[in-house]
Amino acid sequence: MAGPGSTGGQIGAGALAGGARSKVAPSVDFDHSCSDSVEYLTLNFGPFETVHRWRRLPPCDEFVGARRSKHTVVAYKDAIYVFGGDNGKTMLNDLLRFDVKDCSWCRAFTTGTPPAPRYHHSAVVYGSSMFVFGGYAGDIYSNSNLKNKNDLFEYKFATGQWTEWKIEGRLPVARSAHGATVYSDKLWIFAGYDGNARLNDMWTIGLQDRELTCWEEVAQSGEIPPSCCNFPVAVRRDKMFVFSGQSGAKITNNLFQFEFKDKTWTRIPTEHLLRGSPPPPQRRYGHTMVAFDRHLYVFGGAADNTLPNELHCYDVDFQTWEVVQPSSDSEVGGAEVPERACASEEVPTLTSEERGGFKKSRDVFGLDFGTTSAKQPAQPASELPSGRLFHAAAVISDAMYIFGGTVDNNIRSGEMYRFQFSCYPKCTLHEDYGRLWESRQFCDVEFVLGEKEECVQGHVAIVTARSRWLRRKITQARERLAQKLEQEAAPVPREAPGVAAGGARPPLLHVAIREAEARPFEVLMQFLYTDKIKYPRKGHVEDVLLIMDVYKLALSFQLCRLEQLCRQYIEASVDLQNVLVVCESAARLQLSQLKEHCLNFVVKESHFNQVIMMKEFERLSSPLIVEIVRRKQQPPPRTPSDQPVDIGTSLIQDMKAYLEGAGAEFCDITLLLDGHPRPAHKAILAARSSYFEAMFRSFMPEDGQVNISIGEMVPSRQAFESMLRYIYYGEVNMPPEDSLYLFAAPYYYGFYNNRLQAYCKQNLEMNATVQNVLQILEAADKTQALDMKRHCLHIIVHQFTKVSKLPTLRSLSQQLLLDIIDSLASHISDKQCAELGADI
């Protein structure tokens, strides 16, 4: 049968997970018609570019175009188009073309009247045309005729024709240093500088028919960004994102998103980011931001009088920032890259040690098999771009191209850099555990809370993995239950822990927690399952007080990570309207750090007079009023703490420790791999696998044991442990031979996306080396992965001198040794045979 099953008989994965497979996200393309084995797995063995590698491409020669900044770049097909900017002396209106396949620069063919020389304009691509709007024009050398523009030009890539659109009716105010993008057949422009003041208005115009179109001002709502200029915009998932920019005294590092459908702005909060985790980038201007996959990438700009060159990445799904670490071969001061070292040039096939990384292919199944070259010339080194501002960036395929900008000492650059993106299916670990919490399926513990004895159900495995305090409570409750059963002379069941006789679910374990109320405890439980909390409305008193109750529980339960989350949210939410209520509540709950924050907020010069005139101030307790007045008169000395902040352990860290032994006493299911038992936890398996979810819901084995296979194949013990690491805490790193066994596991076990499958395929494509080729050959033979077996034999034949010295060779089966001999015979020519005989 195709799939794992209980000892009472194996049940096909198709039958078990048939209904559950509908839970796979629509964007995930599983091939449900594929073979039950990996016989039909096709692989591509190169060439690849290193993930997160910066590569310095040929710069633009002066005879083609000047070095520049404040220009625009757009991507069309396999070329980058550069328009305008300034070279430090004059404004430009030339159009340059960079071919990304052969890395050649040229002047683009143009006819008609181009836009006047300008900089700080915008350029976008729609259909087969580039549209240029606005900017700052005139003679900067003589400082004459300088003015902002609001004209709109179209450049047709096919004919090279420049055309100005003459628009009737109301026009946007002339501007420069604005943001522009295309969405739903329209050009959208936002903010900028009109020569006197910064703006934050928005306009749009249809691009389908210039005869019938007109400019329309957009009625924006929500948390509209402050007036700003010199900022980038990027569009992802029907939203436009704006990050930082020049806003005078209001400049921040906030990230805003604009919903095109309802024309509403939202400031994306960062209060959920723990201290100790990567913060958002510094506030800046003159930077770039591009979108790729589910990420936004921010590079460069001027940040508080510095020119940083880190690449920051924002995950739209998880709302987190991180600094992208460049690959090891993105060397500072590396050798100049030959001008032909681009996409069209054949890249040599390298060992995994020489690669240092790999590019992720987005297709999981349909790639052609490649060949491996015996010669492996060294790949030229590349450089990281230096910090710069007023450069420009565009995306072609899975790479970002950055051109020009102003570098140190106000020098214009003519450099072109390429950055290789990575593209992996997202990790669904937190979502899967969160789904288990929301569904309340397979709950085996019930917490009885407070004086009202309200009940909240949960899962022993998750709770005991995340909280030592709750683990002790659960252990004590189990011991009391065991003593009670012993006193009542009740028969102790011999089944596996957590499995009642006849396969029925055991009764819930009751755990009393008198110091907790239901609502804050549910927020705490949500954190245990997902490592985050759904933040309520910022600044609303009721919601802030709720998080304060959660904070109190976090302190009592010794959950450092949750404690930090709550503190950051509360401190970010304190304002003039709620500070007194929060301060009084902090005093009542004995939350000294929050109370200190509120007191310091109240006595600020800009706050104090307003606060003491409020009616809420009159109702404060006398001790608190006295404390506020004394603090205002004599502020306590500030003593910065040198103690590092303990941010606690994450969900991933806790689940890793739980699998490695910390959760042994709470196992409630036994997985049998070729007769060898491996205790595990039902709730965790059900959360991560629709197969196990369906089994435990409808086909729970009576003896609490489940046989493990993937189709007709039983994986190796090492591969099985790799699969458990993925299930428990999302680990995808594994030996290549494990990947052969686990390639089909996402399909059979109903994982919620193909992340594991993508990593397995990539692992096989990139990491077959002389050192592990024999182990992979054995796994390929056992799983009947014919392409992989042929590739291993190919490596063995071409590297036989090295392979023959491996001790594993002598432990291969007779059939595999014969396969190696057959392959050697097929590839050795008569001349090589003669040379071999002479050596002997």
From Swiss-Prot:
Record PTM text: Phosphorylated on tyrosine upon induction of apoptosis, leading to its degradation by the proteasome.
Subcellular location: Endomembrane system; Recycling endosome; Golgi apparatus
GO molecular function per UniProt: small GTPase binding
Residues annotated with N-acetylalanine modification: A2
CDD domains hit by this protein: BACK1_LZTR1, BACK2_LZTR1, BTB1_POZ_LZTR1, BTB2_POZ_LZTR1
Regions annotated as coiled coil: none
Kelch repeats: 79-128, 130-185, 187-238, 239-285, 295-341, 399-450
Region Disordered, annotated ranges: 329-353
One GO biological process term: protein ubiquitination
Residue intervals of the BTB domain: 443-537, 667-736
One GO location term (cellular component): Golgi apparatus
Keyword Acetylation: yes
Gene3D superfamilies: Kelch-type beta propeller, Potassium Channel Kv1.1, Chain A
Alphabetical UniProt keywords: Acetylation, Endosome, Golgi apparatus, Kelch repeat, Membrane, Phosphoprotein, Repeat, Ubl conjugation pathway
Pathway annotation: Protein modification; protein ubiquitination
InterPro entries reported for this sequence: BTB/POZ_dom, Kelch-typ_b-propeller, Kelch_1, LZTR1/Attractin, SKP1/BTB/POZ_sf
Family as reported in the entry's similarity comment: Belongs to the LZTR1 family.
Record's subunit section: Homodimer. Component of the BCR(LZTR1) E3 ubiquitin ligase complex, at least composed of CUL3, LZTR1 and RBX1. Interacts with Ras (K-Ras/KRAS, N-Ras/NRAS and H-Ras/HRAS). Interacts with RAF1. Interacts with SHOC2. Interacts with PPP1CB.
Described purpose of this protein according to its UniProt entry: Substrate-specific adapter of a BCR (BTB-CUL3-RBX1) E3 ubiquitin-protein ligase complex that mediates ubiquitination of Ras (K-Ras/KRAS, N-Ras/NRAS and H-Ras/HRAS). Is a negative regulator of RAS-MAPK signaling that acts by controlling Ras levels and decreasing Ras association with membranes.
Protein name per the record: Leucine-zipper-like transcriptional regulator 1
Organism: Pongo abelii
Gene that encodes the chain: LZTR1
